[in-house]
Amino acid sequence: MASNQNQGSYHAGETKARTEEKTGQMMGATKQKAGQTTEATKQKAGETAEATKQKTGETAEAAKQKAAEAKDKTAQTAQAAKDKTYETAQAAKERAAQGKDQTGSALGEKTEAAKQKAAETTEAAKQKAAEATEAAKQKASDTAQYTKESAVAGKDKTGSVLQQAGETVVNAVVGAKDAVANTLGMGGDNTSATKDATTGATVKDTTTTTRNH
């Protein structure tokens, strides 16, 4: 009987050694897989951040270019209005000179009409220049908002990739632990497997199932 006990102890020790060896191999593989996943995640995050940075730079450059174009257009509009005002005033002056021989009343009316026309032209030019300036400001504001939203989206995407990688690592470790627990449950010695504190609820469930059969 003592020989049977010794033989049982030997088999139990041998089973435990094989189990520990297999557990170590599985944990090593899990750690290696987790390291590869983390490295891939870091690389992906770096690529995403670089792409976002490049996109932001391109958008900002485009915004600057559009703002410069709008500024040039506004300046051109203002210059054209100034030229038009000068031409109108000059034409009015010439008309006034030509009508000098007419009666004082007629001359006064023409001069007043010329002044009124010049004032209307100047006012229209100012209004057009103001509208062009406001449109340029609005366009620059919209472009800046788009740039900001693009940067925030790239950051959120990077955070999501890192979170998914973390979940993958956790799932891999849990899967390795469950596999070890199932191996212990099928080892033959149900009592010893149930007493192993590291196997958890999975080994206990397996032991119960084995006894029922």
Curated annotation (Swiss-Prot):
Biased segments, Low complexity type: 193-213
Record protein name field: ABA-inducible protein PHV A1
Annotated region described as Disordered, given as residue ranges: 1-158, 182-213
LEA 11-mer repeat repeat residue intervals: 27-37, 38-48, 49-59, 60-70, 78-88, 89-99, 111-121, 122-132, 133-143
Transmembrane segments: none
Cleaved signal peptide residues: none
Signals that turn on the gene: By abscisic acid (ABA).
PANTHER family with a match to the protein in the record: DAUER UP-REGULATED-RELATED (PTHR47372), RE19971P (PTHR47372:SF11)
Spans annotated as 11 X 11 AA tandem repeats of T-E-A-A-K-Q-K-A-A-E-T: 27-143
Entry keywords, A to Z: Repeat
SUPFAM superfamilies with a match to the protein in the record: Apolipoprotein A-I
Compositionally biased intervals (Basic and acidic residues): 13-23, 41-74, 81-98, 109-140
Family named by the database record: Belongs to the LEA type 4 family.
GO CC aspect terms: nucleus
